[in-house]
Amino acid sequence: MKFTKIATPEQIDQKWVLIDAEGKTFGRIITEVATLLRGKNKPCFTPNIDCGDYVVVVNASKAKFNGLGKIANKEYFSYSGYFGSVKSTKMTELLEKNPEKLYKLATRGMLPKTKLGAKMIKKLKIYASAEHPHSAQLAK
């Protein structure tokens, strides 16, 4: 009889991965990022342990968007809890002003809604241009 091996935090090797978003489709980038952050591409994947990699996304503002007007119609809502305080932001506005936030919101929707998911999203580094301060980590 075979048993499933459960990985321990000491056995997990977390690497740094660089993704260039220029010319790629937004949804496919986010799917790849969520898979890497979660660690589902590794043979030692364990759902209750953070075994994902650190992900650096560059050229975030140069990604392609497909779909029938999704970028123009999609809205993100924020609500503080007070009456009448629902704020909505269109996807186009978010892409122009703060593409980093757009990527974080989309990726967060694909990760677990737990403390582990919050820990995973902290390992995502997004930059609108090609420059980033993580060249030392990526060189390893």
Curated annotation (Swiss-Prot):
Classification from the root reads:
Bacteria, Pseudomonadati, Campylobacterota, Epsilonproteobacteria, Campylobacterales
Tell me, what does this protein do in biology? This protein is one of the early assembly proteins of the 50S ribosomal subunit, although it is not seen to bind rRNA by itself. It is important during the early stages of 50S assembly.
Q: Which NCBIfam families match?
A: rplM_bact
Listed InterPro entries? Ribosomal_uL13, Ribosomal_uL13_bac-type, Ribosomal_uL13_sf
Recorded hits in SUPFAM superfamilies, A to Z, give:
Ribosomal protein L13
Q: What is this protein called?
A: Large ribosomal subunit protein uL13
Q: Which UniProt keywords apply?
A: Ribonucleoprotein, Ribosomal protein
Domain of life the protein comes from: Bacteria
Per the record, its GO cellular-component terms are: cytosolic large ribosomal subunit
Q: Which Pfam families match?
A: Ribosomal_L13
State how it assembles: Part of the 50S ribosomal subunit.
Could you give a single Gene Ontology term from the biological process aspect?
Answer: translation
GO MF entry, a single one: structural constituent of ribosome
Q: Which family does it belong to?
A: Belongs to the universal ribosomal protein uL13 family.
Species name: Sulfurimonas denitrificans (strain ATCC 33889 / DSM 1251)
Q: Does the keyword Ribonucleoprotein apply?
A: yes
